[in-house]
């Protein structure tokens, strides 16, 4: 008798969980924006060029906006050009 009650309760529980999960909306794909800026110094002044642009981005934005795919290009006159992508619809 106990086994039947436990089995029945388990079936009800699993059906409720399934019903709840089937009503959730799928997650929307994030939209990425591009950020560019020029800075003093070269891309290799303080190590890895991608890391330099990553930190340049964080200095210009709040910590919750995380950049990705950062790239650095040297410009004439001891300058560097940074470009990063970030999620802009958060």
From Swiss-Prot:
Leader sequence residues: 1-19
Pfam families given in the database record: SCRL
Keyword Disulfide bond: yes
Name of the protein in question: Putative defensin-like protein 243
Similarity comment text for this entry: Belongs to the DEFL family.
Species per Swiss-Prot/TrEMBL record: Arabidopsis thaliana
Lineage per the UniProt record: Eukaryota, Viridiplantae, Streptophyta, Embryophyta, Tracheophyta
GO biological process: defense response to fungus; killing of cells of another organism; signal transduction
Protein localization: Secreted
Cystine crosslinks: 33-88, 43-72, 53-82, 70-84
Protein keywords: Antimicrobial, Disulfide bond, Fungicide, Plant defense, Secreted, Signal
